[in-house]
Swiss-Prot record:
Pfam families: EF-hand_7
Domain EF-hand: 7-42, 43-78, 83-118, 119-151
PANTHER family attached to this UniProt entry: CALMODULIN LIKE 3, MYOSIN LIGHT CHAIN 1, 3
Residues at which Ca(2+) 1 binds: 56, 58, 60, 62, 67
Organism this protein belongs to: Blattella germanica
Protein name as annotated: Troponin C, isoallergen Bla g 6.0201
Family: Belongs to the troponin C family.
PROSITE patterns (alphabetical): EF_HAND_1, EF_HAND_2
Length: 151
């Protein structure tokens, strides 16, 4: 379960608990198909049986939370860094209306506000000040990437 990000474990726990109606710490393997469909994956019965056999290590016909996470982690698409960078480049391009390679700090402020409606004006000011250290009022793609990925 180490490879699953903590926030996804929380979501998986909620889903697991929703299917664990009797609150006994396990769910029936018959629910697996339904759960996978909810995660956006549809499998034929043979494939489903094969996955269940692999994941239900103790052959109990029930999945404990740990087994459920093992199963779910196979279908949680972890975006690789390259795909993420591509998506962020596209987003940047959309906001860079003049195509000059930068956006204004005002536009960045709007983007950040859209991403997190709970962010305060003070937090925004601090972030913008940190990003736009030269006070130019603009942000290039590298600076934008730094903000969006925290790297």
């Amino acid at each position: 379960m180490d490879e699953i990000p903590a926030e996804q474990v929380v979501l998986l726990k909620k889903a697991f608990d929703a299917f664990d109606r009797e609150k006994k710490g396990c769910i029936s393997t018959e629910m697996v198909g339904t759960i996978l469909e909810m995660l956006g994956t549809r499998l034929d019965q043979d494939m489903l049986d094969e996955i269940i056999a692999e994941v239900d290590a103790d052959g109990s016909g029930e999945l404990e939370f740990e087994e459920f996470c093992t199963l779910a982690s196979r279908f949680l698409v972890e975006e690789d860094a390259e795909a993420m960078q591509h998506e962020l480049r596209e987003a940047f391009r959309l906001y860079d209306k003049e195509g000059n390679g930068y956006i204004t700090t005002a536009v960045l402020r709007e983007i950040l506000k859209e991403l997190d409606d709970k962010i305060t004006a003070e937090d925004l000011d601090m972030m913008i000040e940190e990003i736009d250290s030269d006070g130019s009022g603009t942000v290039d793609f590298d600076e934008f990437m730094e903000v969006m990925t925290g790297e």
